[in-house]
Amino acid sequence: MVCLARRILVGAVFGCAVIALHSHAQNRAVDIYETKESLSLQVRDMYQREITGKVVVTSYKPTGNCPFPILILNHGRSGTDRPQPARFRYTQQACFFVKRGFAVFVPTRIGYGEFSTSPDPEDSGNCNQKNHAAMAEVASSQVIAVLAFARQQSYVDARRVVVVGQSVGGYTAIATAAKNPDGLVAAINFAGGSGGNPQTRPGVPCQAYKLEKMYADFGTTSKVPTLWIYTENDQYFAPSYSQAWHQAFVKSGGLAEFNLLPAFAADGHMLFTAGASLWEPIVTRFLEANGFS
């Protein structure tokens, strides 16, 4: 991937709502600074087509003394409505991480949001002919490029990096960890996977055995601790699949703490966006165990 250009679009300061946490010191409102920029990048899809598009990066940083560790927060995927939302912000989730002292970068990848493209660079093929590897490469290569951009910011500590993601973004986080970018300390996977469809195949992802192999491959090269969070009633990836993926990852040498939470609402796949009070304590413990207090 080649970074071609960068453009500053907006800047704003807003306050995070108070979110109850275990530590009294963290139970406070915090002002954070938000910016929106675009990177022009080139990727190669599963058909070997070169696609140039824009990655919109929404970034948040705390007030106070820097440098701040970097956190890249990766979104999931809608195969039918990729232009929505216009950009991913994850404001509530970003506030949680900013309160813990992170500079947070949320990329809206090529093919999504206001700059959604055709062809779709993350197209992984039909359900019976999935190429999960190509999707992982396209998405993770963009994360690496965003990380390079983040490292250029004067307020970051490039030696301390965490990659986080939900759904396809969680899959992308583990794929990125397998590349061992400089400074990476840990990765967090919320309901990570690909090929799920709760309407046509509830809980049963397309060609899950290929995903199991992908996670095994990731485990052979990944060196940092990872945290995996799934739920009993995930309508995209049932527990039998997420547990098999975790086992494949660990058996191949990956370091992973697996958490299977009870059923959440109608679809546990939405835990990251709607169930913060359930996952925040788990993530807090993991971050503290890896030097982010």
Which residues are covered by each model-predicted region?
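Alpha/beta-hydrolase
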Residues: 74, 107-109, 189-190, 261
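The conserved beta1-alpha1 loop
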Residues: 74-76, 230
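Alpha/beta-hydrolase active-site loop
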Residues: 122-154
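The feature captures the conserved acid-bearing segment of alpha/beta-hydrolase catalytic domains
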Residues: 186, 192-252, 257
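N-terminal cap/lid segment of alpha/beta-hydrolase-fold proteins
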Residues: 26-65
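Primarily recognizes the serine-hydrolase "nucleophile elbow" in alpha/beta-hydrolase
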Residues: 141-211, 217
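Short substrate-entry loop that stabilizes the transition state in hydrolases
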Residues: 66-68, 76-116, 238
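C-terminal catalytic histidine-bearing segment of alpha/beta-hydrolase fold enzymes
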Residues: 250-293
